């Protein structure tokens, strides 16, 4: 496994309060962005990818550990965190590997799993994946983007929008000028 050259000596001399033990599977654009954000929040992160060069790049930039290999493999995940992680986020380009990675993580004791699933054929199976397979969350980036664009278009002149109660309610802020009939 790769480890951060500075972190091993720093951890020995400084007291760190680590928020969560997180495994990120897949170091594409999404995986790299998540790693950057989660590392900035001082989480204990292990990244898994089949490309050792990507792992080395990430490990040299952020205070994370890296494992080369298939994130859907039991042996690879077992090496990431003994006793399971708090969270596994699978962001590879393969829906099937993302699902498998989440299943393996659950069996290893990981509390929460998030899978990036892009194939619309799996849309009807999302409830099954959550309820029966134990996935905490399924994210479809294209669908989420389309939903956000549609939400912005509903209130194009709004300054700010906040959603509540699992997106069932929305609070919208507008700037009203003095000549507005509502004033």
Label every PLM stretch briefly.
Residues 9-183:
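Cytosolic regulatory regions of ion transport systems
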